Amino acid sequence: MKRILKRTALTAGALALLAAPAAAETVLKFASFVPTKYVLHKPVFQKLADDLAKETNGEVKIKIYASGALGKGPVEQYQRAVRRIAEISYGLPGYTSTVFPQSLLIELPGVTTGHQDATRKLWKVMDTHLKSEFKRTLPLAMFVTPPAVLMMRDKPIRTLADLKGLKIRASSKSAAAILTAYGATPVQMPATKVYTSMSTGVVDGALMGTGSLLIFKLIEPTKYVTMGLPEMPTTLFMVMNEEAYKELSPKNRAALNKLTGLGLSLRSAQLEANFGDLGMSGRIEI
């Protein structure tokens, strides 16, 4: 009799385990406007997805949509997170300069001494001054590239006088203001349009980070590169829809917090810098 009762109890326990509902799986859509060969795709985007799945025991997963699969045009990246077309989005605050006036102060000449210093400064004032700019979103990462350089299609720039009247691509309003002060005519456009614009002469050059030489193949239309400009980095961010973040369980939010923030930002900034150095090793007159 005891054996029967014991066996019945074990059977009931096993059935209870089978009947228990499995933890709901959450899949976060990640909108990336760059291709999978981009320098941050595997070591940052994919690694975050892998690490988050591991930390949450598979309860939270990230599905990456690269090359603008959730909508073309990097200018709309921030709004894709706001409208929850994607739960997470990667982009540039400079494309929506009016939304991030304080964040973009980091791009002004003389504010920082390098990409690591700039990234640390952003996160030092994130809670007190910058988070209020992220309406309906939360910053998971925010970092800057090394100083911008002038990439020119057919004219070397040796002095500021050489820039007079030339059409130069700018990434943001702050960069455009600087180019105007230098005597150039700024033309704001997404990075994805620079290759064609330089190749066809729509612009004479571009003010961009060195990583763009390889990422956007600007090494092809670029004949001259001018370095040594005052520190003018490009700011990049990874943002998450605020409601999507709140829908995660407390322990899964903690897991995401652990994997993002300053640490992720510093690593991303350094990877961009390393890639920029590689781009400068091409056959271009400097």
Question: Where in the sequence are the language-model features?
Answer:
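Bacterial N-terminal signal peptides that target proteins for export
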Residues: 1-11
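Cleavable N-terminal signal peptides
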Residues: 11-12, 22
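Residue-level detector of alpha-helical hydrophobic segments embedded in or interacting with membranes
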Residues: 15-16, 104
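Sec/Tat signal peptide C-region and signal peptidase I cleavage site
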Residues: 18-24
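N-terminal secretory/targeting leader peptides
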Residues: 25-116, 125, 132-286
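An amphipathic, aromatic/His-enriched active-site/gating alpha helix that lines ligand/cofactor pockets
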Residues: 119
